[in-house]
Amino acid sequence: MKRIILIVIALTVIYSENGYTRDKAQPSEWGAREPLIEPNSEMAVALLDGKIYVVGGYPSTRISVDTVQVYDISSNSWSITTPYPTTINHASAVGVNGALYVIGGQTNAGGRNKKSSYISAVYAFDPKTSSWTIRAPMPTARSAMAHDVINGKIYVAGGRPPRGNDFAVYDPKADKWTTLPDLPTARNHMAAAGISGKFYVAGGRFGGGFRSEITSVLEVFDTVNKMWTAKRSMSEARSGLNGIAVEGCFHTFGGEHPTAGSSGVFPHHEVYDPMTDRWTRLPDIPIPVHGVTGLAYINDYIHLPGGGTRMGGSSGSMYHQVVHVLMKCN
């Protein structure tokens, strides 16, 4: 049965002197929408023309799939569309110019005895024909990258192989990649957001596995002067987190690491305000998750479909959590 559950939490302003805020004097509503058809984590998520696409990922095992699940906001329902051309996990996806672009990732990868291959392939999905078309590949093969769209172009930074600092931008109209200055802090499994012509990258880890050293660093790339700048770090180091820009704010969710507790998953919803260089901790995710590569914002709600509920890639879930936040940063 389809149910919508809302949790409304009124908060009080508590400012600290070191640039971090625990709470904000604005309500934050957490709720739920129709669950995914199949459990998933480490998948690519993007919004295109009012629909949310969930591409590839791990179901409840570390065997990647080619499934593409589509959520229709208007009917609160999921469907399955044309499979991705290959099994995939840890890819990036964005919706731009009427097409869904899926970039890089890893093929197959299953368990300790299965070999994983990083790929540079880029495919575009046309929702009108439900077909995939191959496009120009990335300059380097990688997965678990930071990505977002700024002024119609797709920026992709870092990722695995471990300690990757590659940074490039893709122009969908020209079908061309351009290499940019390296990400200063090489890392993977981080969150990113494009705000006012700048590309923000937060958190991540330095090694390949989820027990690797993690970071709280925040670095920002100015797409005009082509320079990186360090900003205030997150209040706590996290990897396997995800992020999205809403009303000029950089929202980050979840993450994984043994320091997060028994499940190894962070419940954090922490927001960065570029105008004040401050981080604000909003009410936690009701069901903590990691491994949702990309989020979707539509009709005033941020959608977090699926995600892993324990460290690693074998705990994909069907949860579809949403949050309505009134915080504005512009």
Give the ranges of each region predicted by the language model.
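Sec-dependent N-terminal signal peptides
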Residues: 4-12
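Kelch-like beta-propeller repeat domains
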Residues: 21-330
